[in-house]
Regions:
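Short, hinge-like loop/turn segments at secondary-structure boundaries
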Residues: 50-54, 84, 127
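Short, well-structured N-terminal submotif of metal-dependent ribonuclease cores
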Residues: 1-35, 45-58
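Acidic, PIN/NYN-like endoribonuclease modules and their adjacent C-terminal/linker elements
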Residues: 1, 100, 104-127
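Conserved beta-strand segments of alpha/beta enzyme cores
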Residues: 32, 64, 125-127
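Active-site neighborhoods of divalent-metal-dependent phosphate/nucleic-acid chemistry enzymes
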Residues: 19, 64-113
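Histidine- and aromatic-rich ligand-binding microenvironments
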Residues: 5, 36, 92-93, 114
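A generic structural signal for short hydrophobic patches within well-formed alpha-helices
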Residues: 9-10, 40-43, 117
């Protein structure tokens, strides 16, 4: 299962051709994809035009919806944040710590274009 971060979805809906959006285009037809509940909120709230909002909702309805949080993930996310901080790395957004931790706990790969996740890949085993 591959969870797709908002950093990729935003570029995708803007029509930006990046390595990640090109991969997403291929994966939409061939792989089981997931979206986190808070990522869904973040993406949908950005649409101004109702038609585009509805089109995005239909696309997201075909994906697995993953609850990102919960007590176990929250505690493990705090541990992961602290591990990185001890290495001199500060993650800019708490939500990124939660997303990365959910992926690691659930064995998901994360498709992203956000440097905050690079430290999770390098030091904590995020795929």
């Amino acid at each position: 299962m591959i969870l797709v971060d908002s950093s990729v979805w935003i570029d995708y809906f803007r029509g930006s051709a990046t390595k990640q959006t090109q991969r997403l285009d291929l994966l939409l037809d061939t792989e089981a994809l997931a979206i986190g509940d808070l990522i869904l909120t973040e993406i949908l709230q950005g649409f101004v035009i109702d038609r585009e909002f509805d089109e995005a909702r239909r696309l997201f309805a075909s994906l697995k919806l993953v609850a990102l949080g919960g007590e176990d993930v929250a505690i493990e996310a705090a541990r992961n944040f602290r591990k990185l901080r001890k290495l001199g790395i500060t993650v800019r957004q708490t939500i990124d710590t939660v997303i990365a931790t959910r992926c690691m706990v659930s064995g998901y790969e994360l498709l992203h274009d956000d440097r905050d996740f690079d430290s999770f890949e390098k030091h904590l085993g995020l795929r």
